[in-house]
Amino acid sequence: MSLNAETKAAIVADYARGEGDTGSPEVQVALLTASINHLQGHFQAHKGDHHSRRGLLRMVSRRRKLLDYLKGKDLARYQDLIKRLGLRR
């Protein structure tokens, strides 16, 4: 249920702040959002898959923590990121 290498590379290229940037909060949140969106279809087909649902909730929690960190660090970057990703915040 993970993303393939080409998809990850495209996301990193779109959200990186510089060359070789894979660890910035923007990149991490974008990758988590793509994984979360990818799992949505799986859960529509497999409603009883509670083991994977726990992993999904971990991803959502990690994304929230990264967004909270970014919001406290740089509000403009935070607002730009949630607008680009289409998150409801």
From Swiss-Prot:
<dbReference type="GO" id="GO:0022627">
    <property type="term" value="C:cytosolic small ribosomal subunit"/>
</dbReference>
<keyword id="KW-0689">Ribosomal protein</keyword>
<comment type="subunit">
    <text>Part of the 30S ribosomal subunit. Forms a bridge to the 50S subunit in the 70S ribosome, contacting the 23S rRNA.</text>
</comment>
<dbReference type="GO" id="GO:0006412">
    <property type="term" value="P:translation"/>
</dbReference>
<comment type="function">
    <text>One of the primary rRNA binding proteins, it binds directly to 16S rRNA where it helps nucleate assembly of the platform of the 30S subunit by binding and bridging several RNA helices of the 16S rRNA.</text>
</comment>
<dbReference type="InterPro" id="IPR000589">
    <property type="entry name" value="Ribosomal_uS15"/>
</dbReference>
<dbReference type="GO" id="GO:0019843">
    <property type="term" value="F:rRNA binding"/>
</dbReference>
<dbReference type="GO" id="GO:0003735">
    <property type="term" value="F:structural constituent of ribosome"/>
</dbReference>
<comment type="function">
    <text>Forms an intersubunit bridge (bridge B4) with the 23S rRNA of the 50S subunit in the ribosome.</text>
</comment>
<dbReference type="InterPro" id="IPR005290">
    <property type="entry name" value="Ribosomal_uS15_bac-type"/>
</dbReference>
<keyword id="KW-0699">rRNA-binding</keyword>
<keyword id="KW-0694">RNA-binding</keyword>
<protein>
    <recommendedName>
        <fullName>Small ribosomal subunit protein uS15</fullName>
    </recommendedName>
</protein>
<dbReference type="Pfam" id="PF00312">
    <property type="entry name" value="Ribosomal_S15"/>
</dbReference>
<comment type="similarity">
    <text>Belongs to the universal ribosomal protein uS15 family.</text>
</comment>
<dbReference type="InterPro" id="IPR009068">
    <property type="entry name" value="uS15_NS1_RNA-bd_sf"/>
</dbReference>
<keyword id="KW-0687">Ribonucleoprotein</keyword>
